[in-house]
Amino acid sequence: MKVVSFVNMKGGVAKTTLSINVADCMATRHGLRVLIIDLDPQFNATQALVHGSDYVGYLEQGGHTIVDIFDDNPRVQTSSVKGESPAQPLALEEIKPMVRKDNLFLLPGALELYRLDMSGGQGREHRLKRYIDIVKNSGLYDLVIIDTPPTPSTWMSAALIASDYYLVPVKPEPLSVTGVDLLRNVINRVKENYSLGIECLGVVLTISDERETVYKNAKEYLDSAAFWKGKRFNKSLLKRTEIARRQGNQELILDTDDSKLKMAIADITREALQKLGLED
């Protein structure tokens, strides 16, 4: 089982869009059992995959979220059936993801993640790694994809500690492109602090129009910069204004009738699987 974190320190680069659609394509087109872990306190991946009313119902029925991994203190749990009741922290072995569709599973995010004290010295940043080790030993999944917050944080560190690889979505604009070097410095610092062997799976240009100068400039920079040379995926995620609207309706790229967009996500997914050694 391989674990990949999708990371970038800038919002608006289609990080979540890329992560959930690559996961869906791996599950739908390649028959892999994929677990998405939503580690972003804004839980955009969860909102793009689960309708709001279904999410509320899931919580009311006692469904588990990312908070259950990191919160080791008793807390009040609200249920439409039982009302408010004290809830003891779960053992990591007890935490079960929800089923999104055949082969695609989700450990949802939650705004409640914001209330947790993740200051240094508590060791909570290692809890995700311990959970993923349990998941790995279960044999239930072929791949775990972690959607991370767009800021350097303990959450990002937790994701990197738990991962074998990281993938960087980059929007072809000057600030995003130059920001990848800052991101690399942050990742290197985490690698050194925790003695990690995590590797870069690659860079995917997103929200791309190959006719635009900014796209050509971004491509040229990534293909010539010492560290990033050879790491750019051959295919880019195309610019489509309707993607955000469709995600608001929990529609994934493979659900659309946009053949070029579907081909792009299929090619990106295939290249990722080749890099991971999981190609068909």
How should each PLM-predicted stretch be described?
Residues 1-280:
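P-loop NTP-binding core
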